[in-house]
């Protein structure tokens, strides 16, 4: 009986051990720390080019594909307030229009920049930031945004496959709580 108990314990321990190994492998980032650091450096370069209004440099940062995407403020009412711009020609035109509108300053909170691997050739970055821009009715005061980028490895370089810029809505105004009067 004791031998059966020991055998069952060893079998269960082996089963749980292999389950833990499979679970930890599934949760491991598919990109190593060095690669994630390279993508962080590419993010810094993207911010630098945007702040310099270097449209040609920004063009080279994007994946050259009709599937490349930029989500940004639209100046055309029929597109809605925010719209997706697909393909490099549309992205280049949108970036040109934004840069031509006046000063544009992107100030990311690098302490909150997060880069994760999704696959060996795909990563995603997230960064809250303030953006100062006078494009499409924006008043040129810094406002909070979130920038979410999907990075795609092309040859030996990491390119922006999609860049989604989302405005952070203002916090709701707290309304005073009305207390009902007590009757004695």
Where are these regions (language model features)?
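Short, low-complexity N-terminal intrinsically disordered segments enriched in polar/charged residues
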Residues: 17-61, 176-183
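Hydrophobic/aromatic beta-strand elements that line small-molecule binding cavities or substrate pockets
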Residues: 95, 110-115, 129-131, 146-152, ...
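A short, structured loop/turn motif at beta-sheet edges
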Residues: 115-123, 138-139, 151-157
């Amino acid at each position: 009986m004791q031998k059966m108990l020991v055998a069952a314990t060893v079998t269960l321990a082996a089963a749980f051990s292999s389950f833990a190994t499979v679970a930890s492998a599934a949760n491991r980032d598919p990109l190593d720390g060095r690669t994630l650091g390279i993508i962080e450096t590419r993010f810094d370069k993207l911010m630098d080019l945007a702040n310099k209004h270097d449209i040609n440099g920004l063009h080279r940062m994007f994946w050259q594909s009709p599937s490349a995407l930029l989500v940004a403020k639209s100046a055309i009412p029929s597109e809605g307030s925010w719209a997706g711009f697909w393909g490099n020609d549309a992205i280049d035109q949108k970036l040109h229009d934004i840069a031509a509108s006046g000063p544009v300053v992107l100030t990311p909170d690098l302490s909150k920049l997060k880069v994760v691997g999704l696959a060996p050739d795909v990563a995603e970055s997230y960064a809250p930031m303030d953006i100062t821009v006078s494009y499409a009715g924006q008043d040129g005061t810094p406002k909070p945004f979130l920038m979410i980028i999907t990075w795609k490895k092309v040859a030996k370089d990491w390119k922006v496959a999609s860049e989604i810029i989302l405005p952070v809505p203002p916090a709701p105004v707290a309304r005073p709580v009305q207390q009902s009067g007590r009757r004695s």
